[in-house]
Curated annotation (Swiss-Prot):
Binding site for substrate: D36, R60, G82, R139
TM ranges: none
Keywords carried by this UniProt record: Amino-acid biosynthesis, Aromatic amino acid biosynthesis, ATP-binding, Cytoplasm, Kinase, Magnesium, Metal-binding, Nucleotide-binding, Transferase
Family: Belongs to the shikimate kinase family.
Keyword Transmembrane belongs to the record: no
Encoding gene (name): aroK
Binding sites annotated in the UniProt record for ATP: G14, A15, G16, K17, S18, T19, R120, Q156
Function: Catalyzes the specific phosphorylation of the 3-hydroxyl group of shikimic acid using ATP as a cosubstrate.
Protein name: Shikimate kinase
Subunit structure: Monomer.
Length: 172
């Protein structure tokens, strides 16, 4: 990639956005940024605390402000939060300011990858499968709408997926 364009990774929790994003940034000599980490840094608290105190709506407002800033940078690989695509403004920013890659995965893989993670407020429930299925129904069409590319992450290592994305971008 000759030009320093942004790469935005979207997809559900547990798809591998952060892990794959780090590999991708390293391979492309770009900076890796995780929007959830930036929200935590700016807030001075973790995501679960923000959800507890401000609710999902408060969190989404913070996320929107962070994405407004981050999408204006150049040469970054950005792992977005799973729900960032709920906002039309976020979808528009992502589409206009970089290449969007949807990391697709199954509910089974999401459950396996997130089952011990207590930092996922939406999964702190008796039936995480039901929550993930509901989120998939709501969000998957939005991921598809905004994506320039879609890559399934289920049975491949993060490094292999990152290599696939690099090849797609080179063929672009």
């Amino acid at each position: 990639m000759a030009e320093k364009r942004n790469i935005f990774l979207v997809g559900p929790m547990g798809a591998g956005k952060s892990t794959i994003g780090r590999h991708l940034a390293q391979q492309l000599h770009m900076e890796f940024v995780d929007s959830d980490t930036v929200i935590e840094e700016r807030t001075g608290a973790d995501i679960a605390w923000v959800f507890d105190v401000e609710g999902e709506e408060g969190f989404r407002k913070r996320e929107e402000a962070v994405l407004e800033d981050l999408t204006q940078e150049q040469g970054i690989v950005l792992a977005t939060g799973g729900g960032s695509v709920k906002s039309k403004e976020n979808r528009n920013r992502l589409s206009a300011r970089g290449v969007v890659v949807y990391l697709e995965t199954t509910i089974e893989k999401q459950l396996a990858r997130t089952n011990r993670d207590k930092k996922r407020p939406l999964l702190q429930t008796d039936n995480p499968r039901e929550v993930l299925e509901s989120l998939a129904g709501e969000r998957n069409p939005l991921y598809e709408e905004v994506a320039d590319y879609t890559v399934r992450t289920d049975d491949q290592s993060a490094k292999v997926v990152a290599n696939q994305i690099v090849k797609m971008l080179e063929e672009r």
